[in-house]
Amino acid sequence: MNLAGKTFAVWGLTFKPKTNDMRMSPAITIINFLLEFGAKVKAFDPKGFEQAKNIWGDKITYAKNSYDALEGADCLLLLTEWNEFRRPDFDKVKELMKSPIIFDGRNQYDGDRLIQRGFEYSCVGKRFK
C-alpha cells in the first residue's frame, strides 16, 4: 500500500473527548505511521492542538474546523468521539473529500447508511459488504 502523498483528515487527537490530554491517544501511533510512509495529515481537535504541536510541530496541518480538515482528503479518520463529530453533514463531507472513504475508529456512524450514500466505510470489529 502506497501512502506517499495521500492526505488523511483526522478528527480527534486527544484520547477522549472534553480534554486536551493526548497521553496514550491512538492518534499518536496512527499519525506517526502515516507520516513515516509519506502521507499528509490535516487534523482537527477542539482542545488538543497545543499538545499536538509539541508532538508534531509543523509536520501536520492544523485545520480551522472539522470541515476544513476534509478539503481534498483521500480518507477521513475519526479517532475521538467529540460531540461535534457525531452528526456531520455527510453531503458536505463527501463534497469536500477527494475520495469518500471513512475509517470510524469509534464505531460512531451507521456504516450501512454511509455505504448506501456512496462512502467506503470501515470501523473497528465489523465487516461491511
Predicted regions and their residues:
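Structural/interface elements that position substrates and couple domains in central-metabolism enzymes
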Residues: 1-129
